Design a protein with these regions (language model features):
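Non-heme Fe(II)/2-oxoglutarate
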Residues: 1-83
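Catalytic core of non-heme Fe(II) oxygenases with the double-stranded beta-helix
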Residues: 68-127
Length: 127
């Protein structure tokens, strides 16, 4: 099922996320890719344990938990922290399937990933 939830973040939250990410230090996105799709991933990613990723991840998680449509559709028990990706100069992530099992970095345990989400922080005309 694909579910579109417009305006998950408030304008202030969105602007804060964008401002923070514009000053972030990005690394190779392959660090979180499984073996099968490593050759497909050509992007940059914020380090999962960076202060920016932790702060912005909490903002997104709080917004998702407060959104009745998201909450009723996903019924989340546990959230994995969001991954923040940046695509520049032809960057892409080819056809792939997200990992079904991932390690939660703060809980240090492996979890099934039954629901996958993408939160766009830029307007479509900026791609």
């Amino acid at each position: 099922m694909i579910l579109h939830i417009p305006n998950l973040l408030s304008l202030d939250e969105l602007n804060h996320c964008r401002q923070t990410l514009s000053q972030a230090e990005w690394t190779d996105g392959k660090v979180t890719t499984g073996y099968q799709s490593a050759h497909l991933k050509n992007n940059l990613q914020l380090a999962q344990d960076s202060q920016q990723a932790l702060e912005l991840g909490q903002i997104i998680q709080n917004a998702a938990n407060a959104n009745p449509l998201f909450f009723s559709a996903a019924l989340p028990k546990t959230f994995l922290p969001p991954l923040f990706n940046c695509y520049q100069h032809g960057g892409n992530f080819g056809m792939h399937v997200d990992n079904a099992i991932r390690r939660h970095p703060q809980l240090n345990q492996y979890l099934r990933t039954d629901v996958s989400c993408t939160v766009f922080l830029t307007n479509p005309d900026e791609y």
